[in-house]
Design a protein with these regions (language model features):
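Bacterial N-terminal signal peptides
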Residues: 8-18
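Positively charged n-region of N-terminal signal peptides that target proteins for export
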Residues: 1-6
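Mitochondrial intermembrane space
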Residues: 20-106
Length: 106
């Protein structure tokens, strides 16, 4: 039987090297993440007067992405001023945003 003092030391050592992901983040961390996603998606949309529609949706870590719906006006000459809607996927690993038109979601 191991020494009673050895067990906590072994558990502590294993916990520091274990690849188990954190199960929760602080409220401040989630708020910062939402702000980062919003800024990246608004910028990537290319829409004039871009704004989020609803809230940022964070998928679990197995997906590694967050999503946002962005509305605004198209700047391109043929569609200038028309309302546009884009779906944005934010990759949490690369911290990059990709957008695709989502006008049919109206």
């Amino acid at each position: 039987m191991p020494s009673p003092r050895l067990v906590p030391a072994v558990i502590s050592a294993l916990a520091t090297i274990s690849p188990v992901p954190a199960l929760a983040s602080s409220a401040d961390a989630w708020a910062a993440h939402r702000q980062e996603v919003a800024a990246a998606c608004l910028r990537a949309s290319g829409l004039v007067d871009a704004r989020l529609v609803g809230s940022v949706i964070a998928f679990d870590d197995s997906v590694g992405s967050s999503a946002a719906l962005v509305a605004g006006r198209y700047p391109q000459a043929p569609m200038a001023g028309q309302e546009g809607l884009s779906l944005c996927l934010f990759d949490r690993r690369s911290r990059s945003a990709q957008v695709a038109p989502a006008d049919t979601w109206r």
